[in-house]
């Protein structure tokens, strides 16, 4: 029985994705998003890969990162905006709710973002992705 398990686990998993891959780096995670994108781009063109991914989103010079941001209104309320189409994509959203270096303007003053506000922005992006902005 152990031989069957080890034989099955040693087989290569297919590397070809089912859907295009997209990565959204939220406010405060831009550097991490760039590193993930760089890794994916290097993996994509790696000569050891048996299946090339040139027909999928990310094979161009822009990579897998999707442009998204959450602008704030003067009252502090915000909205999630995604600049690219995401229909049919496998999305990964990178968010650091403890990124206190992120600020926004509220009544003309710079306010550091709390974990609650990062989480609210994450929910706004998820709502924008699903097409049901509330």
Regions flagged by a language model, labelled:
Residues 1-134:
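PRPP-associated nucleotide enzymes
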């Amino acid at each position: 029985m152990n031989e069957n398990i080890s034989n099955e686990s040693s087989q290569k998993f297919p590397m070809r994705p089912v859907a295009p891959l997209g990565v959204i780096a939220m406010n405060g995670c831009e550097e991490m998003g760039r590193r993930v994108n760089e890794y994916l781009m290097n993996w994509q063109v790696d000569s050891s890969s048996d299946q090339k991914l040139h027909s999928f989103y990310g094979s161009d010079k822009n990579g897998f990162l999707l442009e998204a941001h959450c602008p704030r209104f003067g009252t502090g309320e915000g909205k999630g905006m995604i600049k690219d189409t995401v229909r049919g994509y496998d999305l990964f959203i990178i968010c650091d709710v403890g990124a206190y270096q992120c600020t926004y303007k509220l009544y003309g003053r710079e306010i550091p973002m709390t974990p609650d506000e990062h989480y609210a922005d994450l929910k706004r992006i998820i709502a924008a992705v699903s097409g049901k902005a509330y």
